[in-house]
A protein has these predicted regions:
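Mid-domain alpha/beta scaffold segments of enzyme catalytic cores
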Residues: 1-111, 115, 119, 168
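Catalytic pocket-lining loop regions of alpha/beta-barrel enzymes
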Residues: 91-92, 102-168
Length: 168
């Protein structure tokens, strides 16, 4: 499978939703964001697809908040994201510049940022060091996001992982 062969990520052991949500109850969790990853151009596939996230969110809309992912290098990237927001009901965008190999301020991402602003949806960026094979941290250094924030003051952005190790 693509995930296992490319990233060493295998499906977790079987667990029913009832078991999962019982564990959540113990931990005081009520919801979780589901984050797919489109690596179409950098690695040849998806780690988790928008369709898989959509299906899980439809099963448990009270528990899961689904995000979309779009490889910014795809020629159809804006169309894929608009479909995710309008038709699939996904509520934000997950980008991983290190794995998707783009600088956050690269013009290829501009149409995606504009769509997020238009729909009022947040962007979660993987920021900082990545342990994934082939991921280049130069694309996810925290300073790389400054220009995006400057040019898109209305864009809601989250830098995941606090951009470790470039944090104090």
């Amino acid at each position: 499978a693509f995930r296992g062969d490319t990233f060493g990520v295998w499906k977790q052991g079987p667990m029913s939703f009832d078991e999962l949500f019982a564990e959540w109850d113990i931990c005081g969790l009520t919801q979780a964001a589901l984050l797919p990853l489109d690596l179409t151009t950098s690695a040849g596939g998806w780690v988790v697809t928008n369709e898989q996230v959509e299906q899980l969110c439809r099963l448990h809309p009270d528990k899961f908040i689904g995000f979309a992912s779009v490889d910014p290098h795809r020629p159809d990237a804006p169309e894929v994201l608009e479909r995710a927001f309008r038709e699939q009901g996904l509520r934000g965008l997950k980008l991983d510049p290190a794995s998707q190999r783009f600088y956050p301020a690269d013009p290829i991402a501009e149409p995606l940022y504009r769509l997020c602003e238009e729909y009022g949806r947040p962007v979660i960026f993987h920021a900082g060091l990545s342990w994934e094979p082939g991921a280049l941290s130069k694309y996810s250094h925290p300073l790389a996001f400054e220009e995006v924030a400057l040019h898109h003051p209305a864009l809601r952005m989250c830098l995941a992982h606090f951009a470790w190790p470039w944090a104090r």
